């Protein structure tokens, strides 16, 4: 998700250290201390404007959520949603998805969400896709044994690529939805992007996979 640069975004994040962890490397291995409890930790890589992570936190107060995005302006909009919702079980990080092992110990994260990641359609950009094998190496380290990834996209090419990447990595594809919104799946929390494009008739794909 690309958004216009937001004036004051950096200051906005800096002024809310309760929600925005400015030095996440210091939290490595002690995220339960950061949250002040021993509840499960779920992360969303590429959290966009925060609709999903906030919605999940409201729905599941017994789970700790961490929204991760590298874009400063985007993360500032996510912070707006977190502040408006007053959810106590959300933290936000401005870091790159390829560097997660710098901020989480092995097995410290209980579940991961990848929602509407950049498809990087050109073959020469394959290594930038968040479901490329090098990213899977990183995810496997920070997740527990048989850790889960829940992946959603509206891009058929990226979905097919990701299914193949998961399978080739040796992951188990537990459930697959080829048209999520036409299915009987309950409990879906939509991102802003998902809501916008599904209303235009765009098909949404989803898979749950574990290592």
UniProtKB/Swiss-Prot annotation:
Function according to Swiss-Prot or TrEMBL = Catalyzes the formation of N(7)-methylguanine at position 46 (m7G46) in tRNA.
Query: Which UniProt keywords are given for this protein, alphabetically ordered?
Result: Methyltransferase, S-adenosyl-L-methionine, Transferase, tRNA processing
Q: Does the keyword Methyltransferase apply?
A: yes
Q: Which GO terms describe its cellular component?
A: tRNA methyltransferase complex
Which gene specifies this protein's sequence?
trmB
Protein EC: 2.1.1.33
Q: Which GO terms describe its molecular function?
A: tRNA (guanine(46)-N7)-methyltransferase activity
Q: Which NCBIfam families match?
A: PRK00121.2-2, tRNA (guanosine(46)-N7)-methyltransferase TrmB
Residues bound to S-adenosyl-L-methionine: 44, 69, 96, 118
What is the organism field in this record? Streptococcus pyogenes serotype M18 (strain MGAS8232)
Q: Where does substrate bind?
A: 122, 154, 191-194
Renumbered to this chain, region (Interaction with RNA) spans 124-129
The record's section on Pfam families has: Methyltransf_4
Q: Which reaction does it catalyse?
A: guanosine(46) in tRNA + S-adenosyl-L-methionine = N(7)-methylguanosine(46) in tRNA + S-adenosyl-L-homocysteine
Pathway annotation: tRNA modification; N(7)-methylguanine-tRNA biosynthesis
What HAMAP family does the database record attribute to this sequence?
Answer: tRNA_methyltr_TrmB
Give a yes or no for keyword S-adenosyl-L-methionine in this entry: yes
Q: What is this protein called?
A: tRNA (guanine-N(7)-)-methyltransferase
